[in-house]
Amino acid sequence: MSIDDKVRSIVKEFKAYVPGKSKEEIARNYGIDPERIIKLGSNENPWGCSPKIEEKLLNEVSNLHQYPQPINPELMDEISKFTKMPVENIIVGGDGADEVIDNIMRILIDEGDEVIIPIPTFTQYAISAKIHGANIKWAKFDEENGFKLDVESVLNNITEKTKAIFLCTPNNPTGNVIPTEDIKKIVESTDALVMIDHAYIEYSKEEYDLTSWALKYDNVLVLRTFSKVFGLAGQRVGYGVTSKKVVDYMMRIKPIFSLTRASQVSAITALQDKEFFEKCLKEGIESREEIYNGLKKFKQLEVYPTEANYMLVKVKNGMNSSEFCEALLKKGVIVRDCYSFEGLEPYYFRVSIGTSEENERFLKIMSEIVE
């Protein structure tokens, strides 16, 4: 008998997650100087994290032999001030918001329960739901309607077995927000937990921020992260804002020390450095417009409007997305091939914001490939 006979059948169905490519990988595979590589594939903050974090981390080195605080009061207070939400309604997790997603599935899902996921969207929702025994009911962001959420495709899938509904807004990878009235209709039509993923909400108009709904509705959990505008993707800190009851259940199964000392210090400092946050947000939106307007000039591309720090692009020059992305890689540009996203044809890629210099070089290289 081999280990294959012991592994759960659902795990055998999975394919490994395909992350955005790293500079190190491209330098190694294509022989390109890492300093010349433009990384626009992982929705990161190209200006990095707050410069004040380095000193704080150095001061923390002498404490690394000690376990971190399971719940850091200072971090909770800073998140509370940032979101204007009570500490009692906040749950913080390591591994970005992924830990919050996984823990929600752990407390909600029994074998055979149902989870509704509109696609294309962030792939981790389905992975986490399936591994905990859920049956996925697919709804859709309608490609023929600019990837607007098909609300009826969500509502028509709600049954007595529905335990959770995932709504990513702005949606990854399409970049569009879900209208507030559509989300309200879904939330008020079910007692299932509606997960509103706001990983990119800082880049959107303030009116689209529904974090306060965690106090208005018992069946809402809003996901937030430090990986995007705060520039802490490498520290893996995320959090959820939800009802006190949900927080209580999650605290019962939450990993005790999932947040390291370094990640806690980094997140606290990032929230306190409001000047750097505002700078990154302002320059990020400017960068988004720069890339969007530049790509719109190419007739062989269809560029979708966005409220995030990335945009979805459809290739219409006869190449599929993998061929197109490979051509960019050979010139030292990393974007995200979207072939692995359920619900997308193999002609889409996603491009993240960059610095002005990176954007200029990227658009020049694009002109060489497209025209």
Curated annotation (Swiss-Prot):
Catalytic activity reported: L-histidinol phosphate + 2-oxoglutarate = 3-(imidazol-4-yl)-2-oxopropyl phosphate + L-glutamate
InterPro entries: Aminotransferase_I/II_large, HisP_aminotrans, PyrdxlP-dep_Trfase, PyrdxlP-dep_Trfase_major, PyrdxlP-dep_Trfase_small
Manganese found in the keyword field: no
Enzyme class, UniProt record, top EC level: transferase
An individual GO BP term: L-histidine biosynthetic process
Keyword Nucleotide-binding: no
Top-level division of the source organism's lineage: Archaea
GO molecular function (one): pyridoxal phosphate binding
Keywords for the protein's UniProt record, in alphabetical order: Amino-acid biosynthesis, Aminotransferase, Histidine biosynthesis, Pyridoxal phosphate, Transferase
Gene3D superfamilies: Aspartate Aminotransferase, domain 1, Type I PLP-dependent aspartate aminotransferase-like (Major domain)
The enzyme's E.C. designation: 2.6.1.9
Pathway noted in the entry: Amino-acid biosynthesis; L-histidine biosynthesis; L-histidine from 5-phospho-alpha-D-ribose 1-diphosphate: step 7/9
Cofactors: pyridoxal 5'-phosphate
Residues found modified as N6-(pyridoxal phosphate)lysine: K228
HAMAP family associated with the record: HisC_aminotrans_2
Similarity comment text for this entry: Belongs to the class-II pyridoxal-phosphate-dependent aminotransferase family. Histidinol-phosphate aminotransferase subfamily.
Protein name: Histidinol-phosphate aminotransferase
Taxonomic classification: Archaea, Methanobacteriati, Methanobacteriota, Methanomada group, Methanococci
Gene coding for it: hisC
